[in-house]
């Protein structure tokens, strides 16, 4: 079975193709990978394709998304990156969809009704849901009636109970859809399953905190394989300090800025999402690698940004542990979680009262899908390579007609 996965961002489009005869226990390598970056130049986009040991870069003459996706799919069947004889050989297509609202608690075959729901939720995910719809419609144009599956970032968190998912605001606001949805659900679910598998323990028996630390970052409290709490909320702006996002702040700050300094909603939205977090405090970058480099050079604001990041991370790990009423496994994943030994080390300090102890040598040895806790630690600490594309492909396998 050939499974195509599309993962659309606000300014990029990633895709890969898996060729499966059976469902393996661990993530296989896709036979083809591609990505489109629409931010390189206002006049054109850059398509990068990897297949058959070859990497190609192609400038696309248009910023038109459907045309770009069609050109990307063309590299599956033509040129040096050809891996299938005909696009009709693709059995099913899976899409990452950021926001599924309260309607979907699991992956779903895409129908006109599902498309309408994704469209209806655009106000809650204005940068992403339109891109997902464009991807779905581009596949319809190029591949016709091939089955398509939507895998929602919010679905895994539908199990969060009302005491955590609702805000302490006038109750009627919740009837307007204002509630905590949570995001990164596909990653959180995959990592919890993978951690249990690597530890050789039943998922149902474990209490885990999953730390998805990338440019966007969130934690989830996973009990018995179900999400019971998370740090992102109504939008991906809530929770942890992130690369360029503020995370949780006193909402009174926004009222003050609007009233006293005439800030408007659009400018506040831009500042909180794109000019805050590590970038806002350091004045350097939202990239953790740039922050740690500047720290090593003695930059005090970079040091402050890092210390704030760790403080807020540890505070919210504590919040997740409180929701779980205990902890068996702490998992680090995504760009920072997988690659920054320093972040993992600092985030794991101070928990000795809880029986958590890191093995510093293992932590520094570029671990991947490994337990980096000491032998005597009562809490296991895992580094899991997130595999959202594979998780989407796996859902397609299970839903395939």
UniProtKB/Swiss-Prot annotation:
InterPro entries to which the protein is assigned, alphabetical: Ac/propionate_kinase, Aliphatic_acid_kin_short-chain, Aliphatic_acid_kinase_CS, ATPase_NBD
Gene this chain is encoded by: ackA
Molecular function GO terms recorded: acetate kinase activity; ATP binding; magnesium ion binding
Classification via CDD domains: ASKHA_NBD_AcK_PK
NCBIfam families cross-referenced by the UniProt entry: ackA
This protein's name: Acetate kinase
Cofactor(s) listed in the protein's UniProt record: Mg(2+); Mn(2+)
Involved pathway(s): Metabolic intermediate biosynthesis; acetyl-CoA biosynthesis; acetyl-CoA from acetate: step 1/2
């Amino acid at each position: 079975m050939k499974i195509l996965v599309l993962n659309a961002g606000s300014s990029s489009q990633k895709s890969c193709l898996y060729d499966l005869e059976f469902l393996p226990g661990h993530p296989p390598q896709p036979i083809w990978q591609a990505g489109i970056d629409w931010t390189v130049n206002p006049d054109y986009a850059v398509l990068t394709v990897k297949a058959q040991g070859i990497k190609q870069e192609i400038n696309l003459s248009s910023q038109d998304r459907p045309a770009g996706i069609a050109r990307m799919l063309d590299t599956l069947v033509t040129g040096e990156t050809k891996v299938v004889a005909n696009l009709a050989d693709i059995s099913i297509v899976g899409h990452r969809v950021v926001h599924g609202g309260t309607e979907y608690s699991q992956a779903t075959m895409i129908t006109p009704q599902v498309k309408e729901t994704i469209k209806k939720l655009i106000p809650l995910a204005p940068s992403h849901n339109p891109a997902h719809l464009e991807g779905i419609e581009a596949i319809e144009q190029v591949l016709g009636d091939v089955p398509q599956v939507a895998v929602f970032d919010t679905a895994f968190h539908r199990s969060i109970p009302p005491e955590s998912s609702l805000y302490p605001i006038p109750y009627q606001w919740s009837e307007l859809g204002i509630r905590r949805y949570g995001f990164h659900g596909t990653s959180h679910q995959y990592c919890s399953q993978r951690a249990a598998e690597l530890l050789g323990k039943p998922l149902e028996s474990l209490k885990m905190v999953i730390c998805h630390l990338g440019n966007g970052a969130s934690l989830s409290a996973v009990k018995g394989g179900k999400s019971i709490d998370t740090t992102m909320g109504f939008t991906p702006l809530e929770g942890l300090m992130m690369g360029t996002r503020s995370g949780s702040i006193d909402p009174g700050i926004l009222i003050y800025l609007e009233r006293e300094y005439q800030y408007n909603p659009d400018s506040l939205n831009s500042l909180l999402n794109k000019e805050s977090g590590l970038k806002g405090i350091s004045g350097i970058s939202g990239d953790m690698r740039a922050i740690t480099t500047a720290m090593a050079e003695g930059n005090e604001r970079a040091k402050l940004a890092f210390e704030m990041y760790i403080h807020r991370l540890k505070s919210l790990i504590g919040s997740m542990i409180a929701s779980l009423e205990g902890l068996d496994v702490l998992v680090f994943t995504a760009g920072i979680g997988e690659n920054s030994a320093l972040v993992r080390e600092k985030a794991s300090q101070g928990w000795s009262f809880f029986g958590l102890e890191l093995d510093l040598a293992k932590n520094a040895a570029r671990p991947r899908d490994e337990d980096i806790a000491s032998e005597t630690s009562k809490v296991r600490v895992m580094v899991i390579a997130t595999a959202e594309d594979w998780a989407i492909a796996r859902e397609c396998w299970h839903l395939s007609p």
